[in-house]
Amino acid sequence: KLGKIRKIYVEYHQGWLSKLSEREGNAQAAWRTDPKRSGKSGCMGDIGTHAAHLAEYISGLKIKQMCASLNTVVEGRMLDDDGAILLRFEENATGVLTASQVAAGEENALKIRVYGENGGLEWAQQEPNTLTLRWSDKPAETLRAGSNYSDRESSYATSNCRTPGGHP
């Protein structure tokens, strides 16, 4: 119903590495920011990959090309803790992926917006029961997991939900 996919925005923001926590006794931060223990990538390897997989899964399109800007924001850190990637998908769709572990105040903010020629959708992990659909020719719709919708598309979404309303 969205039509041919044109644009995908996906983001995964956390704030738990806003400070140099790896040097303050945080064992989780210590191994995740040490390239000898966690590998060559920090933020993008840790959470950016989840955002990329979500974009491919939701859109049904595979990423074909990317151009990344990775940053180490917190002085003294050995790996990237923030970054942005321009994406090119199959069927000439484009996208932007941002991932950050220095977004102070954020817990686990994974969010996606997908736009096609007829409309778009938005979903956020912090509101997992809600899917917002926006159309070029009618008002936006908000679907909730476990609700009993009668139209074909909404009932398809509801029938594919494994949990009752109000459960993540």
Question: What is each PLM-predicted segment?
Answer:
Residues 1-77, 131:
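Predominantly a Rossmann-like dinucleotide-binding segment in NAD(P)-dependent oxidoreductases
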Residues 5-8, 96-100, 123-124:
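Beta-strand scaffold of nucleotide-dependent catalytic cores
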Residues 10-16, 70-74, 91-93, 101-103, ...:
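Glycine-rich beta-alpha junction loops
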Residues 24, 28, 32, 57, ...:
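C-terminal glycine/acidic-rich active-site capping loop/insertion
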Residues 49, 75, 98-106:
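Glycine-rich phosphate/pyrophosphate-binding beta-alpha loops
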Residues 50, 78-83, 89:
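Substrate-positioning beta->alpha
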Residues 61-62, 77-79, 93, 106-110, ...:
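Glycine/proline-rich active-site loop of Rossmann-fold NAD(P)-dependent oxidoreductases
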